[in-house]
Amino acid sequence: MDREKQQLSIEAARLYYQSDYSQQQIAEQLNISRPTVSRLLQYAKEKGYVQIRVMDPFEDLDALGSILEEKYGLLEAHVVFSPTPDYAGITHDLSRYGAEYMHETVKDGDIVGVSWGTTMYQIAQNMQPKQVKGVEVVQLKGGISHSRVNTYSAETIQLFAEAFQTMPRYLPLPVVFDNADVKRMVEKDRHIERIIEMGKQANIALFTVGTVRDEALLFRLGYFNEEEKALLKKQAVGDICSRFFDAKGNICSSAINDRTIGVELQDLRLKERSILVAGGSRKVSSIHGALTGKYANVLIIDQHTARALVNDL
């Protein structure tokens, strides 16, 4: 009798869990009553013939975050669930989370430094108003170019300023000058010097990383000639605030860096919260270099990219 019950319970379990039969359909198929089907399914679970495993993606996310915090010495690592490894989808999910994080984090009296780029603009578009007092929002790098490619630099900082009930502090300059001497002369302007100093004093910095791929935004803005692009592609893995670094996080071209205006990478290490929002397979090396250089102490990343970092790229 026990053997017959075992076989019947297994058959009922197969129909229920593998073939999606209802208990009534199983009863008709096996010529038994519906209550008997229910008892057989319970028996199958008790005997271990059926093992139900609930996959909680968020449990894995917490573990990934802890590993990243330890590996890179981060204050916080937030791993955001994104259904697919598609870059556009990842950016959408990270941007929503980034906006929520900023809404929760910014408090009265904070100075918030903001970069620009596709990810930053999407975060800005997701920002919700927050009643805070005395907050300053400052642009961390220049955003003017000769190209028709829109950086949305002005729109980005405007949206952040509106969210925190303040006026935006623009840095109305090219991010990369043709000549380092001209850049140094411009930096001496009283207004420009004050904006750059405010970016340096910001206790919160929000930024992403760029790549050195052909389609990288900075490569499409007309700042670099072909020789400079080739150099950056060969030596760099990415950029933060238009300052290029190698796999170890070191500045890879002092000549180009000297022409770049805005926050210095070393200043990001001194922030109360230096927040990097980035994800996607194309940015794995860039993120690794940025974290190795200790330019961020808070990371917002998707689980696909997080696993690549945990598995050493």
UniProtKB/Swiss-Prot annotation:
State the encoding gene: deoR
Q: Name one GO biological process term.
A: regulation of DNA-templated transcription initiation
Q: What does this protein do?
A: Negative regulator of the dra-nupC-pdp operon. DeoR binds cooperatively to the operator DNA, which consists of a palindrome and a direct repeat sequence located 3' to the palindrome.
Q: Which UniProt keywords apply?
A: DNA-binding, Repressor, Transcription, Transcription regulation
Q: Which Pfam families match?
A: HTH_23 (PF13384), Sugar-bind (PF04198)
Q: Which residues bind DNA?
A: 23-42
- The protein's name in its UniProt record: Deoxyribonucleoside regulator
Which organism encodes this protein?
A: Bacillus subtilis (strain 168)
What molecular function terms (GO) are annotated for this protein? carbohydrate binding; cis-regulatory region sequence-specific DNA binding; identical protein binding
Chain ranges passing through the membrane: none
> Subunit info?
Homooctamer.
Misc. comment: Deoxyribose-5-phosphate is most likely the effector that modulates binding of DeoR to DNA.
What is stated as this protein's family in its record? Belongs to the SorC transcriptional regulatory family.
Gene3D superfamilies to which the protein is assigned, alphabetical: 3.40.50.1360, Homeodomain-like
UniProt xrefs under InterPro entries: NagB/RpiA_transferase-like, RNA_pol_sigma_r3/r4-like, SorC_transcr_regulators, Sugar-bd_dom_put
